Amino acid sequence: MADHKGTDNIDHNDVLDGSWCLITEAECEDDTLVDLFEESTNDSVVSNLLDDSESIIQGNSEESDRCIQELKRKLNVTPEKQISELSPRLSAVHITPERASKRRLFNDSGVVEDEAESNTIQVDSLLVQKDAGNQNGAECELNSILRSNNIRATVLCKFKDKFGVSFNELTRSFKSDKTCTPNWVITAIGIREDLRDACKVLLQQHVEFLEMICNDFSVLLLVEFKVTKNRETVLKLMCSMLNAKEEQILCEPPKLKSTAAALYFYKKIITDTCFKYGTLPSWVSRLTIVEHQLASADTFSLSEMVQWAYDNDFTEEASVAYNYACYATENTNAAAFLASNMQVKYVKDCVAMVRMYKRQEMKSMTMSEWISKCCKEETIGEEWKEIVQFLKYQGVNFLEFLIALKQFFKCTPKKMCIVIYGPPDTGKSMFCFKLVQFLKGQVVSYINKSSQFWLMPLQDAKIGLLDDATHNCWIYLDTYLRNAFDGNTFCLDIKHKNLQQTKLPPMIITTNVNVTTDESLFYLRSRLTCFNFPNKLPMSDKDEPLFTISDKSWTCFFRKFWNQLELQEDAARDPGEPEHPFCCTARNSVDFD
């Protein structure tokens, strides 16, 4: 019989035996739901979320931690360098395309995060070493100064530690930064060595003497400049040369009379422990060198003192004595004056000589030259209008006033006395005192009529003033001074001298008496030029006069009406100056400022 086509029949039992294919059947057991859940979660990635460490034996836990700690100590993690540190441009190179950043409110929970991963970033040790190297000694000194609460006290303390002496023992204090002197003691803290060495050369063009004492990053300078300088100028110069801040520098003048201060600087020079340029200052030589002390014992010269007082226009004994004593620090003759036991006599003789010189100088000048000398400041302004407006306010004809003033300055007979009369508080005294003060005139008072010398100040004046003349004063003038107002020579009684033949200078008189209507003064009236001031002087809310007349007002007035007053001056020389400056001693022997 032929074979059947197709698949051979397979016995049912063979199929069950699995000889041709495998059949897996589910094995069902009587397991509880809890057991099934535990078995299903054995291989889960979120296992051990619940902390069941309490069930572990405590001894095993401590041993495990100890092993981990020892393992960590042996592990050397290679620190990762940031890409930006390797190359500034390498961080811009990417292989993978950039993806848009995801917005996240919070960081990941860290479930799949490896806590053992090291995020250590290597710190460049070379950069730290470089920053530490920049902190040199000069910068450390500067930082310690700038960080202190009291900078000056810190600098003074550092100075004493460096140089072994207090800065205040070497210097005297100038309260003002504008006070000038050629001698200065300068100290700077926290200065670089190269700048300090360069300063030695740069300062030589500014000074006559330079002494530089160096200690570490600090420097002490004793300087005598070629010209006088104030503290502001010195600080600007030193800050630019040393590239320093003003807080690092102290600048004061030396104690010119302190032997200890002079010996400190002199000792540094002779021991060759400092840099020196130029000749030794005179104040150091005077206090340290014996030969110089013997040579400085000069005899006092009165002529030099007189010349000094004349040049500075000192005519009072008190001003001469005080100012010449202050001048002793700079002038040997003034120092000899202080060392003398006859200072009072020298002062009196000096003032007497200066007054005689000044008196003769004034007498040798014409009125035009004297007015021009008083107008030293040739200012062109509009202040002269104050005088014109005040005269107009008082109802005075300005043209008549100019004519009277012209005759007044020329000392025309019977026209050399101007009288200003009127009620009180009209500005008569203010107007006249300003004019007399400007022309450096003298004031006499009838209160001294009991003295026969009450007219003596008029011999030393180009113009005189008699303020507030009463009726009794007019009777005296009418009785004794008619010929003096005529411009004639009269006899004047001078204290400790014989009677002097002199002429009365142009006089200005203020009074409340109307001399133009008083018949008792009929013979004196023709010798007077009178102006009436009837209006009360206007005042401001602060009780100040609205008309402000000053020396500048009179200067502008005379410059404005110079030709109208027929005043003349020599065009060949400066106005108000003599042909040759007065000299009562050899100029080369006087030390000038």
Swiss-Prot record:
Residues spanned by motif Nuclear export signal: 86-95
Motif (Nuclear localization signal): 72-74
Start and end residues of each stretch annotated as DNA-binding region: 134-297
Classification via SUPFAM superfamilies: Origin of replication-binding domain, RBD-like, P-loop containing nucleoside triphosphate hydrolases
Domain called SF3 helicase: residue spans: 382-546
Enzyme nomenclature, EC number: 5.6.2.4
Modification after translation, per record: Phosphorylated. Sumoylated.
Cross-link (Glycyl lysine isopeptide (Lys-Gly) (interchain with G-Cter in SUMO)): 503
Main subcellular location of this protein, as a coarse class: host cell
This protein's record includes keyword DNA-binding: yes
Catalytic reaction(s) noted: Couples ATP hydrolysis with the unwinding of duplex DNA by translocating in the 3'-5' direction; ATP + H2O = ADP + phosphate + H(+)
Modified residues (Phosphoserine): 87
Any one Gene Ontology molecular-function term assigned to this protein's record: DNA binding
Role, per record: ATP-dependent DNA 3'-5' helicase required for initiation of viral DNA replication. It forms a complex with the viral E2 protein. The E1-E2 complex binds to the replication origin which contains binding sites for both proteins. During the initial step, a dimer of E1 interacts with a dimer of protein E2 leading to a complex that binds the viral origin of replication with high specificity. Then, a second dimer of E1 displaces the E2 dimer in an ATP-dependent manner to form the E1 tetramer.
Protein name: Replication protein E1
Native source species: Human papillomavirus type 48
Gene, per the UniProt record: E1
